[in-house]
Amino acid sequence: MRSSFFAYAPLVPEGFSRVAAVDCGTNSIRLLVADVNPATGELLELDRRMTIVRLGQDVDRTGRLAPEALERTFAACRDYAETIRELGAEKVRFVATSASRDASNRDEFVRGVVDILGVEPEVISGDQEAEFSFTGATKELKGRDDLARPFLVVDIGGGSTEFVVGEEHVRAARSVDVGCVRMTERHLVRDGAVTDPPTEEQIAAMRADIERALDLAEETVPLCEARTLVGLAGSVTTVSSIAQELPEYDSERIHHSRISRDKVREITEWLLHSTHAERAAVPSMHPGRVDVIAAGALVLLSIMERIGAEEVVVSEHDILDGIAFKVAEGV
């Protein structure tokens, strides 16, 4: 999935820096090349793309990054390196999250990225990940009078979910090891394949695991003080696309859409009890999310039920945008 509109690199506007941000998670790797003005908070997107690489394949079970997962990731990095060169980004920052934090052979991953992109991936903590996500998601929301404070930003990734509460800045943050890939591999896989569809026993075990993770998050983050829930990442945006019955994935219609808790519950129940073929037939469904979207939707629903949120505000701006702002600020 990519978004790029230029046959050649446009000039950098005065007061802006051209930066590239790469976010490598458990399920996907993403690139943003943008012109950023840290003084005004403006971000002019030049290229934004995502590739499903499933870097975290079997990490929860083996503790290692699989050779085929590394090669998929390096192939995407080679594609991104070409785009970064073509657009002339002055600064590049590569942030790696849950899967590479957990892997015993992450040095192999680091060496490969350095060889291809010339920058060393920062294997950041869950708390750092949460701060970047909050910055990216709330930059545009802070001037909105229709959204009450504080925000609770939830970034539902492949291996972990970040919770951040704050108004203008982060007040409290926590990362927990619950994500769409990790929950799928831990609870919905039997004999090397995702159960099609999952059993009620599997679903109940996954729900209990998610609830325990929410208990952990609440030890640090006052979840129930939130007045606006903001949801990030592919599980949330895919649920939005299903709720809107989009004929294809449409970032503009998804960004800042609002989904009611009842609608999220309806979609989650359908995803949990549907077959692979039924999920794959959804027009807006990325092929790489077909097997893991049910777990991601259940994480979102569980959060909404825990805090009593009537709706979730969906944001396409997330950790990538937060990284880009930090790069431009020289942080």
Predicted regions and their residues:
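Short flexible coil/turn linkers enriched for glycine and charged/polar residues
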Residues: G25-N27, E86-A89, D107, G157-G159
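Ser/Thr-glycine-rich phosphate-binding loops at phosphate-binding pockets of nucleotides
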Residues: T26-S28, T97, A137, G157-F163, ...
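Conserved beta-strand/loop subsegment of P-loop NTPase cores
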Residues: K91-F94
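Helical "lid/coupling" subdomains associated with nucleotide-phosphate turnover
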Residues: F6, F16-V19, V36, D58-A89, ...
